[in-house]
Amino acid sequence: MAEGSGIDRKADERMEFSTSKEVTVHPTFESMSLKENLLRGIYAYGYESPSAVQSRAIVQVCKGRDTIAQAQSGTGKTATFSISMLQVIDTAVRETQALVLSPTRELATQIQSVVMALGDYMNVQCHACIGGTNVGEDIRKLDYGQHIVSGTPGRVADMIRRRHLRTRHIKMLVLDEADELLNKGFREQIYDVYRYLPPATQVVVVSATLPYDVLDMTTKFMTDPVRILVKRDELTLEGLKQYFIAVEKEDWKFDTLCDLYDTLTITQAVIFCNTRRKVDWLTDKMREANFTVSSMHGDMPQKERDSIMQDFRQGNSRVLISTDVWARGIDVQQVSLVINYDLPSNRENYIHRIGRSGRFGRKGVAINFVTTEDVRILRDIELYYSTQIDEMPMNVADLIA
């Protein structure tokens, strides 16, 4: 099912926006003056009308304005900047004109597939330039010429330094999941990429969460940006039920998980752990207990990660155990349950994790395992998102069915 066709319009209409004065709402894609072949691709992809974020952000980005767009997961953020990039590039010029940086390889690959689908009638070239893949293939594709490159900061910086990714025609830089990108791990690599870009490059920052320090940092490479910010109270996903299970000791979590599985019939579920070692340990324990599970984390070779994601997307595997590498923007429609085996160590990641369930307004349930030491973290998450996380009721099976 296409990304756009499942957006929860009621929740979308209720969103509160804090926007710059010049932002107007465009209720239809036709009113945005988009290219004919791009419109065809948008409708073929499953969109009928723009979501709240799309109706505000696309025209501003197409005008060339630096833009900060914040909206929760599942509101069509990826299509917002993909449509904008496709509108501003000139496909007659076989040079890179738009660059997207993402924090994970999976997200960069997903963005590439969205761009290719929306640009289906435009003869667009778009390449996923990511670590863990064959460098020779990157070089071949980039030397051939790509209109849009979607990549991870390390590999993109490397290709620019080697002069295979030519930057002189780049008009737009998109930072997707900017909160994660601008965290310490990627900050230097982004500056590395940014200094190779033409001085007039437009910058678009997109994320579900934008902490104040990130907004502060954007002043370094954005000029008078248009701001389209969802008010924080709206950021916990509507339609998602959130619960906790009090688990006295860490050692008891596994038995709690097994009990939970005995009572639930689940389409698909994701279980989050905070470390790669814990993912491997839990996967082994679940398999020993005769549960069919797959697992994924950043230490795995890219080919293996791709194959696990494909199996999960196609429904061949029903339970995926992962670290936060999976939590950023990966869209699997059937996910009905997210279990935080460990509460996220960074409260910003909470919304990214639970946003995997009930995408585009589909109902979903998030269950948090909370030890005595975790109570403070849970309260912090509740305060930060102005939400309430209740103890799990006995009839939770009815809520997920």
Curated annotation (Swiss-Prot):
Residues 58-228 form the Helicase ATP-binding domain. SMART domains: DEXDc, HELICc. Residues 239-400 form the Helicase C-terminal domain. A motif (Q motif) lies at residues 27-55. A motif (DEAD box) lies at residues 176-179. ATP binds at residues 71-78. Its EC number is 3.6.4.13. Coiled coil: none annotated. It catalyses: ATP + H2O = ADP + phosphate + H(+). One of its GO terms (cellular component) is nucleolus. Gene3D superfamilies: P-loop containing nucleotide triphosphate hydrolases. It is found in: Nucleus, Nucleolus. The keyword Phosphoprotein does not apply. PROSITE patterns: DEAD_ATP_HELICASE, HELICASE_ATP_BIND_1, HELICASE_CTER, Q_MOTIF. Keywords: ATP-binding, Helicase, Hydrolase, Nucleotide-binding, Nucleus, Ribosome biogenesis, RNA-binding, rRNA processing. GO terms for molecular function: ATP binding; ATP hydrolysis activity; RNA binding; RNA helicase activity. One of its GO terms (biological process) is rRNA processing. The Q motif is unique to and characteristic of the DEAD box family of RNA helicases and controls ATP binding and hydrolysis. ATP-dependent RNA helicase involved in 40S ribosomal subunit biogenesis. Required for the processing and cleavage of 35S pre-rRNA at sites A0, A1, and A2, leading to mature 18S rRNA. Belongs to the DEAD box helicase family. DDX48/FAL1 subfamily. This is ATP-dependent RNA helicase FAL1. It comes from Gibberella zeae (strain ATCC MYA-4620 / CBS 123657 / FGSC 9075 / NRRL 31084 / PH-1) (Wheat head blight fungus).
